[in-house]
Each structure stands twice: as C-alpha cells, then as structure tokens.
Amino acid sequence: MISEQQKPVNSGFGAKSEPTEVLAGIDLSGKTALVTGGYSGIGTETSRALVEAGCEVYAPARRTDVALNELEGIVPAENIVEMDLANPISVQNFVDDFSSHVNKLDILINNAGVMACPEMRTPEGW
C-alpha cells in the first residue's frame, strides 16, 4: 500500500523529451554504462546519447547480429555481447565475462522490453 500520493519531480522533462536533451551539458567521460535493449527504439537513442556525452556503452543483446547492425558507428562491436534476459545461464555468462574486464559500472539502464508470457519458473525458482 502506498502511504503518499505520487508527486511530480518537476524536472522539466516529459514524454517527448529526447535523450540528448536530458544529457545536454553533462559530461560522462570515463563513465561506463550498460543499456539492456540498447539496440532498438528508445534504447538505440539512449545508447547514442550516452556515447555522445562521453560514456563507454555496453549493449548486451539477444540478437547480436541485429545489435551490431543497429549500433554500427555508435557502440564498438566488442561492447555488444550476447545475453538473453529470459535465460539465467546466458545472464550469468554475460555477468562473468563483463565483470572480468570491466572494473566498474556507473550507469545501468534497464530498458529491455519484456513480453507478458504465462508465468513460468526456472529450476532455481525464479
């Protein structure tokens, strides 16, 4: 139960704000970001804006061929690595690989879309 009504944050940004507007004047040099769903729609533009602000962006992808094509010239190919969020083993493999060569993660954008499928459980109980 929510004890208080939600209140607007009055940031000046809204549904029609572009990622480049939100990041205008912000220097993200030396920062590392991971954008799930970073190769489609809003995710592509978010990845682009973060790179333009100086950020090193990683875009894990279920369909790496599509991601490589969509993010060509934006995100380096070596930063596009296979990860299927619906597969815990794939996620763990990504985490193991990512954490073995990236010292820190400054920004995490959980942008990947999910489909409302019938509830299922993994062997681990998720």
Residue ranges and their predicted role:
Residues 36, 105-113:
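Rossmann-fold scaffold of SDR-type NAD(P)-dependent oxidoreductases
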Residues 43-44:
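N-terminal Rossmann-fold NAD(P) dinucleotide-binding loop
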Residues 117-126:
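Short alpha-helical oligomerization interface
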Residues 1-32:
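Non-catalytic terminal and boundary segments that flank Rossmann-like NAD(P)-dependent oxidoreductase
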Residues 40, 113-116:
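Flexible cofactor-recognition loop at the NAD(P)H-binding site
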Residues 32, 39-40:
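Conserved glycine-rich cofactor-binding loop
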Residues 81-96:
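The beta1-alpha1 cofactor-binding region of Rossmann-like NAD(H)/NADP(H)-dependent oxidoreductases
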Residues 53-68:
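Conserved glycine-rich Rossmann-like NAD(P)H-binding loop of the short-chain dehydrogenase/reductase
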